[in-house]
Amino acid sequence: MNAIPMEHGLALSGVLFSLGLIGLMVRRNILFVLMSLEVMMNAAALAFVVAGSRWAQADGQIMFILVITLAAAEASIGLAILLQLHRRFHTLDIDAASEMRG
């Protein structure tokens, strides 16, 4: 079975990261911002796996596990903020977050 060339994997990772970055900059809904962040983190994880497989090292897979763990923590904190924002202001607009003061 032939492996996917490293250039193709890194190109896919770059495209996914760019799409996530565009979504992060364009959207004002906090749910879409969180989804864009997840796409960007998965693109970075894919780049680690592709680079690790190129040199037959397990480092890429270890970094993948680290990135996925970080993404899970980010998602849980982000969803908690999203729920509080929706409960308090009845909106998911990210500009309303500037009014949240504790």
From Swiss-Prot:
Q: How does it sit in the membrane?
A: Multi-pass membrane protein
Q: Which residues cross the membrane?
A: 6-26, 30-50, 62-82
Subcellular compartments: Cell inner membrane
InterPro entries per record:
NADH_UbQ_OxRdtase_chain4L/K, NUOK/Mnh_C1-like
Known role: NDH-1 shuttles electrons from NADH, via FMN and iron-sulfur (Fe-S) centers, to quinones in the respiratory chain. The immediate electron acceptor for the enzyme in this species is believed to be ubiquinone. Couples the redox reaction to proton translocation (for every two electrons transferred, four hydrogen ions are translocated across the cytoplasmic membrane), and thus conserves the redox energy in a proton gradient.
Q: What is its EC number?
A: 7.1.1.-
Q: Which GO MF terms are attached to this record?
A: NADH:ubiquinone reductase (non-electrogenic) activity; quinone binding
A single GO BP term for this record reads: ATP synthesis coupled electron transport
Quote the protein name from its UniProt record: NADH-quinone oxidoreductase subunit K
Q: Which UniProt keywords apply?
A: Cell inner membrane, Cell membrane, Membrane, NAD, Quinone, Translocase, Transmembrane, Transmembrane helix, Transport, Ubiquinone
